[in-house]
Curated annotation (Swiss-Prot):
Substrate binds at residues 31, 45, 57, 141. Catalyzes the hydrolysis of inorganic pyrophosphate (PPi) forming two phosphate ions. The gene is ppa. InterPro entries: Pyrophosphatase, Pyrophosphatase_sf. One of its GO terms (cellular component) is cytoplasm. This is Inorganic pyrophosphatase.
Length: 178
């Protein structure tokens, strides 16, 4: 069985275009994640509030971050992408975030094969209200769990690509090939 985190390439055009593994489709209240040991999708929890995910949400394979998880990615598309869908995603920015005091950046990307969004090259091209929606969702979705999330800022594609490269490098150091 292929493990979505360890056995799938981050993509041969990274950091500009990466592979993303979707865990949660846009519009869902269920928080799914790939089980680190078994590589299958598990229900982490149903969101405590009436919020729903504003974008397709997942991770970049063979990436690793300080929170001991793969690097998160939000993939914008005109369609809801099913959990465990592999999607080529053009990196356009990053939302810098602290979750309970721990760094938890979210890469913002567009589906490379979706003509309704693949012309977007940088987060600055998104409608300002969309980034406000993302900020609001991530600041508020854990409040009823008594957890604190702080959105520091949104940054451009250049910084986002550096964060992608750093996470791929950390993965290689943390999980050396046998």
């Amino acid at each position: 069985m292929v493990h979505p985190w360890h056995d799938i390439s981050p993509g041969d055009q990274n950091p500009e275009i990466v592979n993303g593994v979707i865990e949660i489709k846009r519009g869902s209240r269920a928080k799914y994640e790939v089980d680190k040991e078994y590589g299958i999708l598990k229900l982490d929890r149903v969101l405590y509030s009436s919020f729903y995910y504003p974008a397709n949400y997942g991770f970049i394979p063979q990436s690793y971050c300080g929170d001991q998880d793969p690097l998160d990615i939000l993939v914008l598309s005109q369609v809801e992408l099913e959990p465990l869908c592999l999607v080529k995603a053009k990196v356009i920015g990053v939302m810098r975030m602290l979750d309970s005091g721990e760094e938890d950046d979210k890469i913002i990307a567009v589906a490379a094969n979706d003509m309704s969004v693949n012309h977007i090259n940088d987060i600055s091209e998104l409608p300002p209200h969309f980034t406000l929606e993302l900020k609001h969702f991530f600041e508020d979705y854990k409040k009823l769990e008594n957890k604190t999330v702080v959105i520091e800022e949104f940054q451009n594609a250049i910084l986002a690509r550096k964060i992608v490269l750093d996470s791929l490098e950390l993965y290689k150091k943390t999980f050396p090939k046998k």
